[in-house]
Every structure is written in structure tokens, then in C-alpha cells.
Amino acid sequence: MEPKPEQSPHHAYPDHWEADVVLRDGGTARIRPITTDDAERLVSFYEQVSDESKYYRFFAPYPRLSDRDVHRFTHHDYVDRVGLAVTIGGEFIGTVRYDRIDDRGRPASAPADEAEVAFLVQDAHQGRGVASALLEHIAAVARERGIRRFAAEVLPANNKMIKVFRDAGYTQRRSFEDGSVHLTLDLEPTEESLAVQRGREQRAEARSVQRLLAPGSVAVIGAGRTPGGVGRTVLRNLLAAGYTGRAYAVNRAFDEGLATLDGVPAHRSLGEIDEQVDLAVIAVPAHQVPEAVADCGEHGVQGLVVVSAGYAERGADGRELQRELVRQARSYGMRIIGPNAFGIINTAGNVRLNASLAPESPARGRIGLFTQSGAIGIALLSGLHRRGAGLSSFISAGNRADVSGNDFLQYSFEDSDTDVALLYLESLGNPRKFTRLARRTAAVKPVVVVKGARHSGTNPPGHAVPVSRIPDATVSALMRQAGVIRVDTVTEMVDAGILLAGQPLPSGPRVAILGNSESLGLLTYDACLAEGLRPRPPIDLTTAASPQDFRDALAEALADATCDAVIVTAIPWVGEDGEAETGDGQVLAAALHTAVAGGSAKPVAVVHVEIGGLAEALAAASSTAAPRQRPTTARTAPPEAPTDREVPTDRTTDTDRTTATDRTASTDREVPTDRTTDTDRTTDTDRTTASAPAAPPPPAAPAAPEATPPAPEDRPRPGRIPAY
């Protein structure tokens, strides 16, 4: 347990300095001020430090701390003398302290604005970014207390510590005196130091999500012997997906003689498992979760998916349970997806993880999906599956007590298997950070967002984050400036995801429209104008146009340097006998694919009415097309991509909506967050048969990426044409 803070005779315990941090390898830890109650922890910590690290700290052999040392290192006034510790499981793994000094290096008080700083990290935790995190936090504390410079003495052989100071990004001076390196750091933040902090944050948070999505072993806690339970369902879905790692079933109610369940080892507790467990899926009643979390922490589990309900969605008592759940998990260095989560999926061939309640694992694809609602997650998975689209990863975070959409953006920025990031968000816990991360991610791959609870002004049950008071129009403007594609409905998100995952991004706003229906072409033209695109006058092929005419017209449009994208509109054509034909979708699909076979770098979308089999034929061709070639690393993108797109302040509610070519289609309705039966249904008052949802026009490249469009060799192979 953490010590109870005491009051200093000089200054109250600064509880606002406490913070949970994500380390370089994705694990979590807590940083807090050291108190007088930490004497035993400090001694135990020091005993686990190697003689070499002790020598680097004190410049001499120093096998143990004296009573005087312990008193000095645990008694602080939190103004002139401050000590911080990094803890995991309540125990120290690293410490830092500063002492205010005058210009002669003697102990001093304000207005002296320089302090001597010293670090010590357990050898087992060196290389995890502990010292860098401590430096970032102790620098913030020092600035709060009026300190402007740090002085440090480092032995020349202590390369790790020298590197920590050098890489921090602060303005610094270095000299060599009396056999040691003397460093002076100006603590005023610089562009470089801020970039370093954000880079550390990005890598750590991305790695923490990656550890959850690619575990080498999974234990399902609460998998019962009776089929149909939540835990048993997760276990069976895990096995049905072909998970490549080790799986275990854990339930304290198992008979002692039970050796296996569904073909995997069965245990009554995690302690019975001799091997490392990376991920635990907890599916037990809420009152049993603390015991399960403690078992996971003691066993060294790296992350948790808590599908158990009964937390913040139940009211004030549940919110307190949820806060305690997060505190408990983080004290052991574990991150949480949930509680009340639907689960996670990773379709990578070397993982094949389906630790969720989704009965069928989606096909492998290039779309990453994050949802806060399990019901909306089901609708999105179903919609993508019906359209033949696959996923790279899926996270349904439930109450989103820990892992959030911001973490997913950090992961998506890094993930080479993801070309498009889709997010269904019901609340924005940190809008400023979300905008910053979305801008950076959108600079390297499209980000599509549906924002629920737009007008209610309240968070959904279970989301214990402050209610955002930002008007919805402002949210739209922020997203647009960040390069985010905001859509209104789940159906539009599916449409946009499929289009962006299978097509190159347009290099500009110019759109060519061609088809055999003048009316449908004009509707498409108007829709493009409404979205700020620059459509060319529609090319009317007339109702007598054959599939070959479509092929020739599309090939000509793709070769035209004055357009950046093409929309094909089609209705049943008139045959040689003068009779309208229902249309052979496979014939038209083949003709369109022939047109793009030459290697076009422009996106092509098809809007059709009652042409049987066209959508299926195009989807089948798309499923066999090569994935988009990724740049060697996403980190080559600037950390803060600029945007030059003007956002009209009087049209922010409409500018981010993906507009269907037929504005009466019901897919433009708001999707209720508690219903999944209607989210993907298409009805159309202007059609006798709604064979497919109305199409959004190909979205222009997000604002941030426009300055650096993908090179032709980085674009997908032609032939991936979506139909709507």
C-alpha cells in the first residue's frame, strides 16, 4: 500500500505532483513525492541496486544507507528539498531529488534559483525510461518552486545518465571538472524539450497498446464450465480465431482434478501457472475483480481486459469502484481496457487474437477500429464484414477508465498494419490532446471519427471524465483543422473506412463524375460542392452506354491530369433490343477494373442503383488486391503537421459530414447509441429498391496530409473499387 501523506512543517504534501506514467516498454508506474513513511521502502530499494549503480550515484563505494542518509532522503520541505519516487506495486524502482543551492553550491532558499539534482534507478528497470520520466516531472516541480536551473555531477563512465540529460532537449552547458562531468540545464521549456516529451509519451503509449494487442499468452479469468457464460464465450472466441500464443482458463470454482477446458490448461488461480502471462481477460462479478487484479499483479501480468460490468455505469458507488480498479492496476504497472469492455481483436497472422465477445473474428485488413460502445462495435464489425472489409485491430473500451481513443491514436500512428483509423467516441476526456494526436496521425494516415452524444451535453453512463462544454460546432472545426474526417453515422464510417483503406488518397479536390444517368450525376455534383470539393461537370454517357463505354470513359478520366478522383454513377442500361436491363454487375465490374489496371493513382468510387451483383463483384476484387504500401516508418511525419485549410465558422456543423449522393437516404440519420438493429439499414424514399447505401464522394485528403501526398509507389494496387 502507498504511504499516507504527512504534513511537512514547511509545506503541505503536494498531492498534485502524483502522476501515473507509461514507461518506454508500455508498462505503467506511479510517480509521487517521497514522505517520511518511506524509510523502509527506501532501504529495500537501495539494497536491490547494484554496486556499480551505487558508485555512479555517490562517486564511491556505498554499500548501504546510514540512518542519517535515510532521514535526509525521506524528509523534505517540498520547496527547497524535494524527492520523488517511481513506484510499481507500492515499491520504489527509481528516485530523484533536488536540493536548492546558491552560486557557491551551498544549501539555500529562495530567491536562489538553482538546484542540484541526482537520480538512482534499480538496475532491473534501467532502460525503461524511468530516469527520463523522473527528469520531466522533477523539472516541472522545480519550475513551480521558482528554480530555473539544475546542476548535476556525473561520472564520465555513466553514459546512461549523461544520455538522459543530453536527450532531454533542455538548453545545457557541460564542463569537465575534478574527474567528473558538470552539467547545467536551463529548465525553461524549449521546442526541442517539448518535442522530446511528446515523443516519449507517443512511443510509450503506443507500446502499451501494442502489448495488449499482441500478447504471447492469455489467461481468461472466469471461464466457467457451463457454456454460454461471458468468460467461456471469450475463451472459445480466442481459440476459434486460431490464437498463436498460449491460452489458459482460470476459475477458482474449478474442481481440483480438472486439467483442461476446451483443450487448454485449466487452473484455479494464476499462481498455479508456471509461465509468464501477458494478458488477462477478467470476466468475474465486480466484487471479485479486486482479488483477480491482485493475482494478476503478483504474477507479473502486463495488461487487463475487464469485461465485467457493475462500475461507473451503476452510479456514484460504481464510479468509486472504477477509480479504485484503475489505481490498483496501475500500482502493479498494468493498463486496463474497460471495465464493461466488449474486448479486443488483432488479426495479424502471427497473433490472431480475438479476446472479445464477437462470435466471429473479422478478416485481416488494413482498418483499425476503436469504439467506446459495445453495441456500436457490433454494428461496425457487422457492417464491415458484410462489405467484405477486414480489420487490423479492434478495441472496444467500454467505460474507458484507462485506455482511451488517445491511446489508440498513438498506436495507430505507429502501426504499420493499419492504413485507416476509425473511432466511435462518446466523450472526449482531453480534447486538446486528442486534437494534437489526431493532427499528427492524420498526417500519415486517414482518421475517421463519429462523435456520439453530440447534443446531450452529458457523458454516457460509465464515462467518468469531465463533461466537455465545447459546442459541437467547435468540435467539428477542431477536427477539421486537425485533418480528421468527421462523419455522422455508423454506415458513413463503414463507407469511409472501406474507401480509404482500399483507395489512394486524392492529391487534390478536383473530382470527375461520369455515368449513364444525368440526374444521378447532377446529384453527385451537388454533393461534392456541398463538401467543399471541386467537381467537373458530369459526363453523361446516356442510358445506352455499355460496360465498354464505362471502361473507356473511366480510363480517359484517370488519364486526365485535371482531376484527382473519379466517381462513376450507374443505373441499369438499355440493351440492344431497347429494353432496360437489370444489369450484370460482374460484367460492369470487370470493365471498370480493366480501366484501372494501368496503374492509376486516383481513387475511384461507384454509385449504382439496382445493378445486381455489382457491389459483390467489386468487393471480391478488392479483397484480393494488395494492401497499401506503407512508408518505412510513420515517425518521419512531423510531430505537429500544419494545416492550411480554412474552416468556415458558420458552417462547422455541416462541413465534416460525408454527403450521400441522394440527400434523402436514411443513412444520414443520427444513430442511437443504444440500438444496433437500425444502424446499417438503408431505406431510400427515392428508390423502389435500395440495393446499396448512397455513396459519399471520395473524401479529399485530410488537411494535414495535403502537403505531403503519398508517392505513387506508396499507393495501393489499382482495382480496389468500392460500390455504394
Predicted features, each with a name:
Residues 1-204, 208-210, 215:
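Long, contiguous binding/interaction regions
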Residues 188-645, 649-653, 667, 673, ...:
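Catalytic-core regions of core metabolic enzymes
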Residues 659-660, 666:
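Periodic short-repeat tracts
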